[in-house]
Amino acid sequence: MDTKLLLCDCAGSQPLNSDKIGSACEMECSKVFTALCTRELEAAAAEIQQGDTIIACGQEQEVFQALAEELNVDAPGFVDLRDRAGWSDEGADAAPKMAALAAEALLPQPVTPSVDVYSEGTCLIIGPGDVAFALAEKLAVTLAVTVLVTDEAEPMSRAFDVVRGRIKSLNGALGGFTLQLDAFQQLEPGGRGAFAWTEVRDRAQSACDIVLDLTGDTPLVQAPAKREGYLRADPKDPLSVERLAFEAAQLVGTFEKPLYVRMEETLCAHSRAEQVACTNCLDICPKGAITPAGEHVEIDPMICAGCGECAAVCPSTAITYEDPPVSALLSRMHILARTYRRAGGAAPRLLVHNAHGAEMIRLAARFGRGLPADLIPLELSVISGFGHAEMLAALAHGFARVDVLLSPTTERDALDRELALAQAIAGANALGLLDEADPDALSDVLYAQDVPQPLADPVLPLGNRRQIARLAAQALNPKAEEPLPLPENAPYGAIAVNTDACTLCLSCVSLCPSGALIDNPDKPQLNFQHDACLQCGLCKGICPEDAIALVPQLDLSDAALSQQVLNEEEPFACVECGALFGVKSTVERIMEKLAGTHPMFASSDKARMIQMCDNCRVNAQFQQEDNPFQSNPKPRVVTTEDYFSKRKDH
């Protein structure tokens, strides 16, 4: 059954063109209702019972969900056309945007993989005794509480355990915290008078499901506000402590933890042969969820909060974001741009935002100017992982400009870096970050923007993030004859080799994690493939001659897909057998430095061995007169002829 869109003009407050919306997004539209959530609720019920219905209302979702539950049918879908398009100073011209938003609502929602987290309610409270003991008394009814007291206070209740110690490390998240303590002591329950304590010992280990930090000191984990199961409160603020007790009591049971990112270890360029190369994700992760693990990195899914910054800055696409996947995000941008043009729009703009931005848009629509008719909002759960590949892809899909609306809690490190990279490829006037906290100010900025011309022939970039960025960059720079210069730390580029210093030892080839550096098995030659280079810097770091320099740039020509010779020389011919080996200039340089000067090569015969291949060198070594491994000559084999020759009568 085809999906039907129920339209409502919200008491006549917005203009709706059902014919244009329906034809552009290829969906049946109802007549335009006026009070679908109140007086015309029976009409809504009749349509919901038909199934496959989307209601153009974001404000009254709960009303229609309750109605569907009462009718014992599946809840309808929802799309907000009013706040994002209809309530606007340009609402009369917003039909193309409404069609685009309606078409986006038809797309299937991707399912994020997840894992179950189990919390049995084992709780550790850390803090001074007067506050920690009172909180433990309340929580002991529902949780298994242990108090790590930080002062000399002693409990008057045995409803919970009490220990002393100094936390050396705390790792993990909800349902799986592990900690190590020094100066650890346990309470001795027996005896009269004050409680006694066990002897002090170090390196004690323990585990718990929930950690309540009442110390008021530096947090024990990175990004404490995003570490699930780790709760903090100011011990001097009774209200925050009470709130902490309520939150902790809810953290018992089975929870669903999304697996935000996927790691492909074989693609990771973190290190090779114990030489560290790429550390982008390690440097930018705000939660400390990423740790080195040999030649690759590991991501702890229990600690990861899903900001997506690691995926945005990963040069090899070893880390990919799954909430949503890049393919699903590209599908949304594609359908928005295509439907907008199909409905008669010309130069759409894209505003990427999160839940905070959605609330600003609603406030601007209700009390201010709303959004311009050519500005299409795209809501994401997190925006910090919206990288240069996604920005370029949006422009390649046909958007004239792309802006990311920041929120007060948005991590900006990756966004700033990715924006600079995208602007170097597409130009500064087509991309930007908006840091506005006032809805009216946001509207003023959006209405005053200069809108550049969009791509005349939009393309559909596919593949991984590197492939998407390259295809989009080619579409945006069709006349680029020279490589585009990029900012430092860009994931694309070339290497410059000082041929005078390079000895063609090829150590860089053996360690290059992406295979951008290639040798030639037939002759001394160093080849390079531009599009495979990650600019990880491993070749530069391990080059014994310091002959390599990184050149961040993006070569959009076809030559970037083939091998280019960076350095080559003639091989040396063995003076004994003529076999080719080594590098001619290197062998000659060694002869110049060692022949006649080094004790091992003092004579001409010994110096000549430098000019031999490996087989001839071994033979010459064993045939020389002063060979230290040489023994007496083998005795000649005695034959019958010898016996005959010794007879006197013969």
What are these regions (language model features)?
Residues 1-144, 148-284, 288, 347-361, ...:
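Ferredoxin-type iron-sulfur electron-transfer modules and their immediate structural context
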Residues 35-41, 297, 383-387, 526:
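Short acidic loop-to-helix transition motifs that present clustered carboxylates
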Residues 135-139, 385, 389-407, 411, ...:
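General detector of N-terminal leader/presequence modules that precede the first folded domain
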Residues 266, 309-405, 545-650:
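Flanking helices and flexible, charged tails adjoining ferredoxin-like Fe-S electron-transfer domains
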Residues 284-317, 507, 511-514, 523-542:
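Basic (Lys/Arg-enriched) interaction patch that binds polyanionic ligands
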Residues 293-333, 403, 410-413, 417-420, ...:
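Terminal amphipathic helices with adjacent charged low-complexity linkers/tails
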Residues 296-306, 497-502, 525-535, 563-564, ...:
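Flexible gly/pro/ser-rich segments immediately N-terminal to CXXCH heme-c attachment motifs
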